[in-house]
Amino acid sequence: MAYSYSEKKRIRKSFGKRPQVLNVPYLLTIQLDSYEKFIQRDSDGQQGLEAAFRSVFPIVSNNGSTELQYVSYELGEPVFDVRECQIRGTTYAAPLRVKLRLVTFDREAAAGTVKDIKEQNVYMGEIPLMTDNGTFVINGTERVIVSQLHRSPGVFFDSDKGKTHSSGKVLYNARIIPYRGSWLDFEFDPKDNLYARIDRRRKLPATIILRALGYTTEEILSMFFDKVNFEIQDNKLLMTLVPERLRGETAAFDIEANGKVYVERGRRITARHIRTLEKDGITQIEVPVEYIVGKVAAKDYVDLSTGEVVCPANMEISMEMLAKLSQAGYKEIEVLFTNDLDHGPYISETLRVDPTYDRLSALVEIYRMMRPGEPPTKEAAEALFDNMFFSADRYDLSAVGRMKFNRSLNLEEGVGSGILSNDDITGVMKKLIEIRNGRGEVDDIDHLGNRRIRSVGEMAENQFRIGLVRVERAVRERLSLGDLDGITPQDLINAKPISAAVKEFFGSSQLSQFMDQNNPLSEVTHKRRISALGPGGLTRERAGFEVRDVHTTHYGRLCPIETPEGPNIGLINSLSVYARTNNYGFLETPFRKVVNGQVTEDIEYLSAIEEGNYVIAQANSNLDENFRFTDTYVTCRGEHGESGLYKPEDIHYMDISTQQVVSVAAALIPFLEHDDANRALMGANMQRQAVPTLRADKPLVGTGMEKPIALDSGVAIVAKRGGIVQRVDASRIVVKVNEDETIPGEAGIDIYNLIKYTRSNQNTCINQIPCVNLGEPVARGEILADGPSTDLGELALGQNIRVAFMPWNGYNFEDSMLVSERVVQEDRFTTIHIQELSCVARDTKLGAEEITADIPNVGESALSKLDESGIVYVGAEVKGGDILVGKVTPKGETQLTPEEKLLRAIFGEKASDVKDSSLRVPNGTSGTVIDVQVFTRDGVEKDKRALEIEEMQLKEAKKDLTEELEILEAGLFTRVRNLLIEGGVSEAELDKVAREKWLEQTLDDEAKQNQLEQLAEQHEELRKEFERKLEIKRNKIIQGDDLAPGVLKVVKVYLAVRRQIQPGDKMAGRHGNKGVISKINPVEDMPYDENGQPVEIVLNPLGVPSRMNIGQILETHLGLAAKGIGDQINAMIKQQQSVAKLREYIQKAYDLGHGSQSVDLSTFTDEEVMRLAENLRKGLPLATPVFDGAHESEIKGLLELGGLPTSGQITLFDGRTGEKFERPVTVGYMYMLKLNHLVDDKMHARSTGSYSLVTQQPLGGKAQFGGQRFGEMEVWALEAYGAAYTLQEMLTVKSDDVNGRTKMYKNIVDGTHQMEPGMPESFNVLLKEIRALGIDMELDEE
């Protein structure tokens, strides 16, 4: 393949055997697309804001005389950009303005005559906007809205699996779930009666619902039952025969016709008997009269002469009834066909327990159940039932629900509305009865065809609709009050409920989460997370095992590996690499189409519903060069996800890639196929906790997923258009765009500003470093600057470390690690953490708080780092307890002694009126102040420091914009110069004249003169734009800040803390192999090899076999090989060998193995080969894709090429004695991560501090500056030792003996080291508790 200039800098050798058919899709699509549909720059009324407005408007007054109509909406421009919102702590949002039309009808004239129309734009609150990276900035912090996996609307048939009733009888039920509205359930009880529930309330016989729909008993019976006809002829009873219905029954009498006995009495009727009856064309047989007794009449039989109902429908026929019927002149009787096998009499039985008899009584019964205690009226009962299922305002199945409903009932797809029809309800009951009769299957609720994804856009739309409905009620009330003269749409609408609903969703919904910003991977994973929790979802406590388990339909849609450990396991999932959602919200995954055993290039996305009907081959099936399957039988997933062997011609589809199954995080684990699933889960989760190191180091052994993740995460800067790098410094990159990519008439310059040392949500450091040089060509979509944890555009979460697997004096017992001092010296795992500390000056009842350097009772030394405004200098080194911002708070007047009054009068001392409430550095923290920001309320005078900061910001803004203008002007004048030279002006003349005068030249060629004039206009436009931008920037910087009520000033101080690795820090590999550092060992004591090269970390070999994560061993071997090749290249460069030799050696390395990647170095120039070699000196980066990785033979070949033993084991020597260890040791390079569980954040010690109010015992936990709990078991230990005095001390003066501990302090100050323990407070608490029980207990102190 052809590589671009940037790609040639470092090429990762891939061992993947299968070529990539489909590139990894953009990883944040699920977030961006969903919100784009909500915002809808291009209106389509089916979804988003437009749909919400259309569903609520027009709002008509109760008397119909006025209506408020919706015309259109538009979103304005946000006031501040994303970065400014983060600094100021505001929400990044755009104002929503809606054009509404108020129409008044003339009530006297004919209907529909318009009297008056008023149209107006109405402000409806702010809508938060999504940033380019799929996040929201809410109150200055970046948040992510996690997608939710919820039960799809539609109808579900289920059973209790025999768990409800003691007999173990399986009870079936059906549930109609709408998108919004009341749930309707049907269920069988143990007696086989069918019941209905509305909104999970008290159950009613299901036939009440049918009666409420307007059906009579007769209609209900004819809907659910087949009929059997009996004829009365000459006192004989003839039955119409349908032979098929007899199958499986025992004949109650001889079945005979035309003198031939077909089945004798007592014999079972088989299929053979039925065939004979059909062959002979028997349609009627004589039956004994008793046979009809007990059968159920299918309709009402009325005596026509008297009008009396002889036999009502659903009545069992007795001999007397039969006599009455024949007396009334009936020759034919219709009864219901039922049997015990597969035609149960359920509806007939249910009608018998149904207390209602017509529509009204049924509606009243439903009304009583829904609104107990209210007196029902006919209108109220009708309105309630209609509104529940048949009103589009209150009930909506949605397009998804209707599609699922129709599929379930085998109706035509795409037909039907969002409300239920009579046929829908009867259809559900019919199918439920069919299932009870043994025909049909219940649904699998965990099937991904029955669960759908609700993403940001949809949830935001629902919240917005809720807000709109609240507004609708208020508007309708206002319209119905009358007196609408001179009223405008603006007066009617109060936008508060809308913005409140939206704000609540983005600010405090369970699915609106604080973004995990540890590193680029954790950001991407958080945005691709799918949660089953949240509003309308499951709860941790009630979710069973089945919901959490991996389901066959997860294949290629949800990752089976990446899920949290703990109570949320299986409820929070991650999207697989290639998965996406379809229009209905179901997850789908791509497949290659197979036609007649040949795999085509066509790619189709299938959802779980569709996939069940096809046979699908795995991605690693063997194909020949014509893309035909080479095996006679291929392992495939057949129907229902069961795997089996199939012939090539029976296969419909083939997987797209071996990493299709797993998520982004799991796809980063090399040799995942050799790890146990539990450890892989830990590996995937721990990569998200890796802290970005000071210098990112790409993994030597990767999987090829590193680049797409780094690109899509948005932490790096990516070229918008191709071109040549014109300027580079630490804070900006300027690219001169290629001619063919510029828009005619623009300067063709792209300017990229870099983010420098800012704080992430997890207090890690975000910093961008350019990775291109001056004059380099860049293509569109290539990386220009690396962000945190990226190295030349590849994700780099940790460091490549030389490890040895061997025990070392017990320092690697129980997963601990022994680390060499060299790792600390080289700052391999040094990280920068940035903390934000803020100080708020409020207006209190006693007066305003003041930020000042004049603090009472504080010595000079404590104020040495503050300026005259009382704010710390940038660059100051501070430690725990230092003052960062001096602040004083007024305190209440105290009664003064006469002496104090005198002193006050003489010296005018006012200092005692205020108390010190300064912002101090928290205990245990130390660092450097890297930035200070001061926010002042509008109308409050700015202090000196605020004005200095403002001035600096203005200077920077002006410098930035001036530079930008210069760059753009330079580009423009280059084009002017070329144009003038082409037009016949000599270069010498041009050089004499000032640049600005060039634009005044006149050319003979008219076309060229036009171009020149165009460029002159552009130049003028650039100048105006510069002035405009500068003015906007100036206003933003100068204006006061919008602070919370009662806040006058906020000072934010940013501290940077540099943390080196130390004992107690947690580290991990990518295979779930985690541990804590036990000791930092001097380099000279570490084991070393024959070349004198020491290892950097010693790991315990016993941690591997029982955990079954062998991937780490293979990674270690492959890492050694990669480093070995790097060492060889390094040696060749040092020996200054010819480029030809280098090229040959590197080519050999890239050609090794059976991978599908081909790198042809003969197309590289010598300079490019040298630059590639320079980047490979530290090791050849390798990629071993998931489930398609390097084979053992390839690893051995690579080790050989690097001049290393193929066993991967090396003889080591003890650094302390110089003795050889008795057997070779596995040594190699493993990619190690430093996790965000640092000992500095956990270390904590207390001498004195705060106490609990009731028990008077010290508080617990680091955040409260609490003590260590000395619990029950610890007390036992001291009792066992007989350490009585220690125990007494622990339980009294060190805990809750208030007087004792005060005395103890006094004694220590006085220098008498005694303790006088008293009564612990907890005894008094016990006393009070016993008294609360009504027992008077007193302590007698004698």
From Swiss-Prot:
InterPro entries: DNA-dir_RNA_pol_bsu_ext_1_sf, DNA-dir_RNA_pol_bsu_external_1, DNA-dir_RNA_pol_su2, DNA-dir_RNAP_su2_dom, DNA-dir_RNAP_su2_hyb_sf, RNA_pol_bsu_bac, RNA_pol_bsu_CS, RNA_pol_bsu_protrusion
Record carries keyword Translocase: no
Similarity field: Belongs to the RNA polymerase beta chain family.
Subunit structure: The RNAP catalytic core consists of 2 alpha, 1 beta, 1 beta' and 1 omega subunit. When a sigma factor is associated with the core the holoenzyme is formed, which can initiate transcription.
EC number(s) per entry: 2.7.7.6
Coiled-coil positions: none
GO MF assignments: DNA binding; DNA-directed RNA polymerase activity; ribonucleoside binding
Species the sequence originates in: Actinobacillus pleuropneumoniae serotype 5b (strain L20)
BP GO annotations: DNA-templated transcription
Protein name: DNA-directed RNA polymerase subunit beta
Catalytic activity: RNA(n) + a ribonucleoside 5'-triphosphate = RNA(n+1) + diphosphate
Purpose: DNA-dependent RNA polymerase catalyzes the transcription of DNA into RNA using the four ribonucleoside triphosphates as substrates.
Pfam family, one: RNA_pol_Rpb2_45
Keywords associated with the record: DNA-directed RNA polymerase, Nucleotidyltransferase, Transcription, Transferase
